[in-house]
Structure formats: C-alpha cells, structure tokens
Design a protein with these regions (language model features):
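Active-site diphosphate/adenylate-binding microenvironment
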Residues: 72-136, 145-148
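Iron-sulfur cluster-binding cysteine motifs and their immediate structural context
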Residues: 28, 269, 277, 281-306, ...
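Thiamine diphosphate
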Residues: 119-253, 263-267
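Short gly/pro/ser/thr-enriched loop/turn and capping motifs at secondary-structure boundaries
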Residues: 3, 27-29, 47-50, 115-117, ...
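General beta-strand structural signal in soluble alpha/beta enzymes
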Residues: 21-23, 40-43, 68-72, 108-111, ...
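Terminal amphipathic helices with adjacent charged low-complexity linkers/tails
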Residues: 2-71, 329-333
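Active-site glycine- and acidic-residue-rich loops that bind
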Residues: 53, 78, 86-94, 158-162, ...
C-alpha cells in the first residue's frame, strides 16, 4: 500500500465513528494512519503473529466489544467441495513456458511469484522455491555444481528489477552457466499488481520510457539475450533450446501481458468433439478453462475435452498443444 492513499483514508475516516485497521503481522498501515492524526486501532485488538482467518478476526472483535457475543450461524460447505491444486489463471502468459519446461525436463530454479505454480501438477517443472531473486543465485550454484544437463531459472519482470539484476551481474562476472528466463507479464501479479520500471507508468501516475530488460541484461554483460512471444508455444520452445545450448550465461525474455493487465479477452476457444481424440494433452496445459466433457471416445472410453466459455480468454495455447487441431476459435468451429 504505497504510496498511502491519504485523501481516501481521510474521507473514509470522516464518515465513521471508529477506524479499525485489520492487517497481518506488523502494524504497518495502522502506524501510518495514526501518524495522520486519525485515532485508529488495530494491534490492540488483533494478533501480531500468524495468519488472520475470518473466525480469528470475529473472535478478536467480540473480545474487544466491537461485535456482539453471538454471531449468526453459518454452514461450512468447504468439506464437500472437491479439492484442487492452485493453477495459473486462464490466459496466463507463463503457461507456455512451463509446458515446454515440463517437456524438456531440465532442472529449474525458482524464487517467489505466480511462476511458483509451475512447481505443481500438471507441470512439475520448477524444483526450488525461495525469496525474490533467489532463483538466479541458485541457478549460478547449479552451474558450478557440475550438473550434466543445462539448467534454467524463472523470475518475473518485477522481481528481476527488484532483486534479480545483482545476482545476474554476479553470475556473468564469475563466468557462470545457465539460462535466466525473465517472464515479463508487465506487472507483479501475485502480490498485488504493483508496477515496475519495465512499464510506462510511474508511482505518481505519470508516464515515462520503460526500462528495456533486454538492454539492461546486455549492459550486465550477457551476450546471449533472446525474446519470445509468451503465447507462441513453438517460439518459446525454440528460444529455450537455443539458450540452453549456449555455453555461458543466457537470458530468455518471454513477453505477454498478465490477463489482469490487458483485460482484453479474445473470443473463447471451442473444441470440435468430432475431431477430439481424448488424448488429454490439452488438460496438461493446466488451464482451468479446459475441462473434461461428458462425451466419450468410442475406442478408448476416455472423456473428451471441452472449454468453459465463461472463463476462457482465447489465448490460444491449448490450440497449439492439441495434436489433431481439434481446438479453434469460434469462427472456425
């Protein structure tokens, strides 16, 4: 929450009797609100440790006399819901990279961000997880360890600017080996869609020329720098193969807007049930919009695929994965 929206906070405070700040861990926002002269409460009510679950917040409010001792009963239906692992969003630009990495089966270092979801099924294509920028340092170590196969790391554009430049420079200076994949989706998506120097917007809502990530990497001494359209499966695969074959430090920048940044979905894709062979390859894309239908393949008995039109944003990665061209835009259905 920076810069703090002081005008908005004052307008809110003027319309209520009491201001209560609910935030996990340290009273970061609470202290700033109090510094504005607003008598806010927070950590005298809520715990400074651990995660604040809804029931914990309600109990703390009851103890502080903010809520009545009795609360309306509610039915917890979570136990009856089917469980599933977290997934990359429909239309996520990282999907093609992790799909290719899962096929190439190379060691992959990660740090923290949306791309951590590449660790989970169906990709299983990221093997370490750490702090922001840790992936580049771990990749450097992998290269020094004498791994027989090439190794790569994944890092987001925002994380690269925040904590990835220094370890990349160190890797080049010390003659490391490996491929740094900078997944440029024009935002820091998992932690709140903060802007970074790679886009035109500034914190003061002005516009500037964005920092060129490729140019910055070359300035750090990286000689092999490639870019690829994140939604072009074949282009990403070709660039990955070229970078991992390079004897030294290479950088691959995959470019594609986060679906919450572009906000311009294309028409949903459609599965031709007559062409679908129920091979399941599109399901391996890990897209939540690609699901199993009730239609069954007559020979194998396996369920065919279909696409949820409400959630599909038409990125087209599933169409490129399908081996029989059974997925197309609605104009070709």
């Amino acid at each position: 929450c920076y810069p703090l929206p002081k005008k908005l906070i004052r307008e809110f405070a003027d319309g209520v009797r009491n201001v209560i700040v609910v935030e996990e861990l340290d009273p970061f926002i609470e202290e700033q609100v109090r510094a504005m002269g607003i008598p806010a409460r927070g950590k005298d009510i809520f715990s400074i440790c651990g995660e604040l679950l809804p029931e914990d917040i309600a109990e703390s409010c009851r103890k502080a006399g903010i809520l009545k001792d009795t609360a309306p009963a509610f039915s917890d239906t979570s136990e009856s819901l089917p469980s599933r692992s977290p997934l990359l969003c429909s239309g996520c630009p990282h999907r093609s990279t992790f799909y290719n990495l899962s096929q190439m089966k190379v060691p992959v270092a990660g740090d923290i961000g949306c791309y951590n979801l590449g660790t989970l099924p169906p990709f299983n294509a990221q093997h370490t997880m750490g702090s922001m920028g840790a992936s580049v340092g771990v990749l450097h170590g992998m290269g020094l360890s004498g791994l027989p196969e090439p190794a790569v790391c994944t890092i987001g554009d925002g994380t690269f600017f925040h904590a990835g430049v220094a370890p990349l420079l160190n890797m080049v200076h010390n003659k490391g080996k490996g491929t740094v994949i900078i997944m440029d989706n024009r935002t820091t998506a998992m932690t709140g869609h903060q802007d970074n120097p790679g886009i035109e917007a500034t914190l003061s809502l002005g516009t500037v020329a964005p920092v060129d990530i490729a140019g910055l990497c070359r300035a750090c001494g990286v000689e092999k720098v490639l870019t690829a359209d994140a939604f072009d499966l074949a282009a990403v695969r070709k660039a990955l193969e070229e970078c991992t074959a390079y004897d030294g430090v290479s950088v691959l920048i995959t470019r594609g807007d986060c679906v919450f940044v572009s906000r311009s979905p294309k028409p949903a894709r459609v599965v031709d049930a007559d062409k679908c062979i129920a091979c399941g390859k599109c399901i391996q894309s890990g897209c939540p919009s690609v699901v199993l239908s009730d239609a069954v393949h007559p020979k194998t008995g396996k369920r065919k695929a279909r696409i949820e039109p409400v959630t599909c944003v038409g990125c087209g990665v599933c169409s490129q994965i399908c081996p029989v061209q059974a997925i197309s835009g609605p104009e070709n259905a």
